[in-house]
Amino acid sequence: MDGKRRPGPGPGVPPKRARGGLWDDDDAPRPSQFEEDLALMEEMEAEHRLQEQEEEELQSVLEGVADGQVPPSAIDPRWLRPTPPALDPQTEPLIFQQLEIDHYVGPAQPVPGGPPPSRGSVPVLRAFGVTDEGFSVCCHIHGFAPYFYTPAPPGFGPEHMGDLQRELNLAISRDSRGGRELTGPAVLAVELCSRESMFGYHGHGPSPFLRITVALPRLVAPARRLLEQGIRVAGLGTPSFAPYEANVDFEIRFMVDTDIVGCNWLELPAGKYALRLKEKATQCQLEADVLWSDVVSHPPEGPWQRIAPLRVLSFDIECAGRKGIFPEPERDPVIQICSLGLRWGEPEPFLRLALTLRPCAPILGAKVQSYEKEEDLLQAWSTFIRIMDPDVITGYNIQNFDLPYLISRAQTLKVQTFPFLGRVAGLCSNIRDSSFQSKQTGRRDTKVVSMVGRVQMDMLQVLLREYKLRSYTLNAVSFHFLGEQKEDVQHSIITDLQNGNDQTRRRLAVYCLKDAYLPLRLLERLMVLVNAVEMARVTGVPLSYLLSRGQQVKVVSQLLRQAMHEGLLMPVVKSEGGEDYTGATVIEPLKGYYDVPIATLDFSSLYPSIMMAHNLCYTTLLRPGTAQKLGLTEDQFIRTPTGDEFVKTSVRKGLLPQILENLLSARKRAKAELAKETDPLRRQVLDGRQLALKVSANSVYGFTGAQVGKLPCLEISQSVTGFGRQMIEKTKQLVESKYTVENGYSTSAKVVYGDTDSVMCRFGVSSVAEAMALGREAADWVSGHFPSPIRLEFEKVYFPYLLISKKRYAGLLFSSRPDAHDRMDCKGLEAVRRDNCPLVANLVTASLRRLLIDRDPEGAVAHAQDVISDLLCNRIDISQLVITKELTRAASDYAGKQAHVELAERMRKRDPGSAPSLGDRVPYVIISAAKGVAAYMKSEDPLFVLEHSLPIDTQYYLEQQLAKPLLRIFEPILGEGRAEAVLLRGDHTRCKTVLTGKVGGLLAFAKRRNCCIGCRTVLSHQGAVCEFCQPRESELYQKEVSHLNALEERFSRLWTQCQRCQGSLHEDVICTSRDCPIFYMRKKVRKDLEDQEQLLRRFGPPGPEAW
């Protein structure tokens, strides 16, 4: 019998879906693709070094580094920011792009042109940013105080203002929550002004309002509460005051009043600011104090659209955990921290640093620094952060793991100077728990690490919020967006690598560097930073709000800005979940398979267009009976399909229509500039801007419909959807009435489906070109029947088209060229859904390709039958059977038992550290169990299934996963009854392989008996064959040896595939990436090899005649 072969490449090896997947003739060890990239980065960086500046910059930074923290030899001059020249505040302005605006309460500072500083504490706004030259800036903005409004009660005059201020001050000082630690008056001023509420059209114009200015932002809430309860005013009793704009954040209030938007450029004019040269409060290179009214805000247009050379740092850590236990900061050490730094606008990282515990072999293209003590390692990284001074910090899951782990570990080891990771001197970074919940994402429990002055952009959180994927592991998203795989090492194996030698620690460092490099690649590829900067500019909110807050603050900011120009105020509404409203219209689909072109007509920006066309806004809403009371004529207001009334633009133009007009016209300008622009960086900015403008316009409608929100208005949201339903129905009627045989067309048109903002029309023509021409003609003709700016546009043609049901269809999409389809488009089908196993998506996609592209229904049916046969005979790889579902809430909060929830609970009992947590996607497969056992009890971890050889419930996958999707596709073609008979019954379903597991059930009590390999007869001895098959023993032996050889060859191919991916052909494969099908295949073949070798041993040792 042959011995086990050495793993090596074989002929016909399929390339792995990774970089470096080609086979070489020799298997000599060579660097991985990532290591070659690192070396190339080093060469590119060497070309840009400025040798004459290095010594000067190095000396300046060493003066600020505490003795013993980082040796001078360990600091690379390239880490440092350029040294700013001397700046004269009297003659030179300070111009910088602000990235973050927050506030603190502290002692007042003297500023040029400002009043003498008061003795008590005052709120100071703080803007962090970067200049064009790359210098870091912190600007302290003084003199701005928080305020809010309230309507003046009847009879209130100037003589009552002093009395109200005294009474409110007294009430706040007595208040248990508001009056603590007050050193001066809480209310600074009460002023009379003329304003108008934005909610509803009243017809009487502005009315008296009180503007109440308080000393500190935290005093707004108690002042509002006490005013709502009632404050005594001499001669007026104890009236109650309704608050307006009392729920606006202090930073938003300041930015609205000064016309500052997120991430725009600010200018401190010469002579108007003071530089702090000594006693600086931050670690920024330039620190200034200025009066709030002297700050100049540049709109992000033209040259002010540029983005400063921001410093982006991506990092990853590795910990040495104990076997079977996820690392815990109280017990398990941090063994490596790898960092990559990028200057925005440059092609490659300028900084590649690996900090390791214990010696590590050199890595070409990266700087390696080793430490014997973990405390020194942690302190070195903390000092490195302060030296490198990043503006943006990114990574993968740094928010919930890396940063909290580092801070907790430093506390455990009592590294007192570690947690100063922000830009404010002496301010520790701390950890707090946070929870976010929405209808779209469910509940997510996260941690928040404060790092004042630096923007945290965790790529995992970005992807969870912006993209719907089957898996969110770094490996899965890297393949999905970058087409790259990475080695994925289990936390228990990391400890073995650390305890090895300097070469194994080098392998771990390369792995850690790549884990830091990939988030940086994702940040660039998905334009995350550029898009976030442009969204902050468009909506006017600080960058951090986009990453940590919901959608509503973006619309509130725009609403406040527009309202301020018109003297309107936003009321504080106590929102409670109210009544729901009818959504968009869906025209009943005419189901079937269409072998003729189907033209799709789409309303451009439907909901924003409706709001602009019909002037739907808070400011134009008429309460029931108001139109008659104000004497409005029929041509001065409209009645919507839902019965609500709004005044027309001739009476008052609404705020929301004005905001939408500005957004959409700005988008049109951005797209026009984008078409002409050639500079790649500027193209990125413009593309991000037009996308931000589009998203912002579409979110305005959602803001009005949010039942629990800042300013919900059911009348607006239900009127918008009411008009939408009416327009879809009218479009159907217009198309079907014009394009008829009676009007001279070859056939009469029919609308086969309509959904929200689009209709699908069958014009009866046979060619795509004719359908396109008629679609464009129909879109122009129908648009003329609707008020501007509502416009119906021709979008695409489907040919052929498979219409299955509401929101479920597929077809070949033609949008520009009639002679070549763009792609196969699927909506609502399992080909694009992520709540089924990959087998479903792959089979549905393959079937659709055969039906729509190849036009081969028989081939599609045959392929589906083959896959079903393979499934029932256990020939499908387990990676194709993995189902993933998100854990959105605790087990007790689910109404019924869920498979992924129950599995998460079982995994938590096995290993609490590595069990899924809220917000994670849980992978599982369904295993066989006794008849009648519920599906949620049969869910199991795929790796656990492989390790314990548990049998898969193939019948479940056929009936619960494959059956319905396949019938939906094939019934329109084969007919309802025939589709089921052909696909789910027949010869291909009669042959089944039933496997038995090694553990559980009756097998725990059963005694195993050997069977004859030839005829399966139960044997009474330990041999391989029975007496009847003895003459065929040699033949049977050769057959099993051949099977073993085939398994060894398959294992060899898979093993070498994985070696290629990890970048070494002479090291063991330790990757355990559950998102890679090769991993499951390799585990399965290894198990099959062990079983086959055990079977061959039953034949006994070869006799002398074999030699």
Curated annotation (Swiss-Prot):
Summarize where [4Fe-4S] cluster binds, as residue positions: 1058, 1061, 1071, 1076
Please give the annotated consequence of changing residue 864 to T. Answer: Found in a colorectal sample; somatic mutation
List its EC numbers: 2.7.7.7, 3.1.11.-
Glycyl lysine isopeptide (Lys-Gly) (interchain with G-Cter in SUMO2) crosslink site(s): 574
What changing residue 757 to A does, per the record, is: Loss of polymerase activity
Q: Where are the zinc fingers (CysA-type)?
A: 1012-1029
Residues recorded as bearing Omega-N-methylarginine in the entry: 19
Q: Known catalysed reaction(s)? A: DNA(n) + a 2'-deoxyribonucleoside 5'-triphosphate = DNA(n+1) + diphosphate
Query: How is expression of this protein distributed across tissues?
Result: Widely expressed, with high levels of expression in heart and lung.
Q: Which domain of life is it from?
A: Eukaryota
Residues forming the motif CysB motif are 1058-1076
Q: How is its activity regulated?
A: Regulated by alteration of quaternary structure. Exhibits burst rates of DNA synthesis are about 5 times faster in the presence of POLD4 (Pol-delta4 complex) than in its absence (Pol-delta3 complex), while the affinity of the enzyme for its DNA and dNTP substrates appears unchanged. The Pol-delta3 complex is more likely to proofread DNA synthesis because it cleaves single-stranded DNA twice as fast and transfers mismatched DNA from the polymerase to the exonuclease sites 9 times faster compared to the Pol-delta3 complex.
Family of this protein: Belongs to the DNA polymerase type-B family.
> Could you describe the subunit structure of this protein?
Component of the tetrameric DNA polymerase delta complex (Pol-delta4), which consists of POLD1/p125, POLD2/p50, POLD3/p66/p68 and POLD4/p12, with POLD1 bearing both DNA polymerase and 3' to 5' proofreading exonuclease activities. Within Pol-delta4, directly interacts with POLD2 and POLD4. Following genotoxic stress by DNA-damaging agents, such as ultraviolet light and methyl methanesulfonate, or by replication stress induced by treatment with hydroxyurea or aphidicolin, Pol-delta4 is converted into a trimeric form of the complex (Pol-delta3) by POLD4 degradation.
**Disease involvement:** Colorectal cancer 10: A complex disease characterized by malignant lesions arising from the inner wall of the large intestine (the colon) and the rectum. Genetic alterations are often associated with progression from premalignant lesion (adenoma) to invasive adenocarcinoma. Risk factors for cancer of the colon and rectum include colon polyps, long-standing ulcerative colitis, and genetic family history.
| Its job | As the catalytic component of the trimeric (Pol-delta3 complex) and tetrameric DNA polymerase delta complexes (Pol-delta4 complex), plays a crucial role in high fidelity genome replication, including in lagging strand synthesis, and repair. Exhibits both DNA polymerase and 3'- to 5'-exonuclease activities. Requires the presence of accessory proteins POLD2, POLD3 and POLD4 for full activity. Depending upon the absence (Pol-delta3) or the presence of POLD4 (Pol-delta4), displays differences in catalytic activity.
What's the protein name? DNA polymerase delta catalytic subunit
